[in-house]
Amino acid sequence: MRILIIGATGLIGTPVARALEANHEVLRASLNGSALQVDLADPESIRNLYTKVGQVDAVVSVAGQTVSRPLSALSDADFDLGLKSKLMGQINLVRLGIESLKDGGSFTLTSGQLSRRPIPGAVAVSVTNAGVEAFAHAASLELPRGLRINAVAPGRVSETLLALKMDPALGTPAVEVAQTYVKAVEGAMTGQTLDVVKSSS
């Protein structure tokens, strides 16, 4: 398959690209640091990306910005960032990419388990993630030509915990998170949210 990955240079996007390129042609795109550049907050940037890459079999989004702050400190701008970048950015990635996807192709979006397992200080993130999941479920009922759409919901990532000086064993290594994206791309499911489950080993 020919697969376009958005956010391919990020903490999760990098291992996702590596895992998929073992058996597929991978096109890497990101805001910075890759040959193909795209800003999810800018619909015109998304249009330009699809014009450059042409037809693909799958689009994987591992991108989008959000803000984590206590509810009392959140501003309209904080909510707007996540809604414009992570939510509407991924919605537009689908809306503007339908014609670029081959018959039977797939969109894989990124939400997060905070949508259903909230924690203090992450209200804006939870709202954005829930929107991504709702969109994937609803859009699956309307996509033409056998196109599929799913959302992957990572939880705590070991490398992020380590950077925060927390126990990385409480999270899932990014290379393991990547396997859920591979499952979404290579599988047959649609309209699903795939939770990244921490390995018991």
What is each residue range found by the language model?
Residues 4-19:
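N-terminal Rossmann NAD(P)H-binding glycine-rich loop of SDR-like oxidoreductase domains
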Residues 29-45:
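Rossmann-fold cofactor-recognition segment
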Residues 40-56:
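Conserved Rossmann-fold cofactor-binding substructure of NAD(P)-dependent oxidoreductases
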Residues 60-69:
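Conserved NAD(P)H cofactor-binding loop of Rossmann-fold oxidoreductase domains
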Residues 70-71, 78-80:
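Substrate-binding pocket helix/loop in short-chain dehydrogenase/reductase
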Residues 82-83, 91-92, 106-132, 136-143, ...:
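Catalytic loop of short-chain dehydrogenase/reductase
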Residues 144-147, 151, 158-159, 164-201:
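C-terminal helical subdomain
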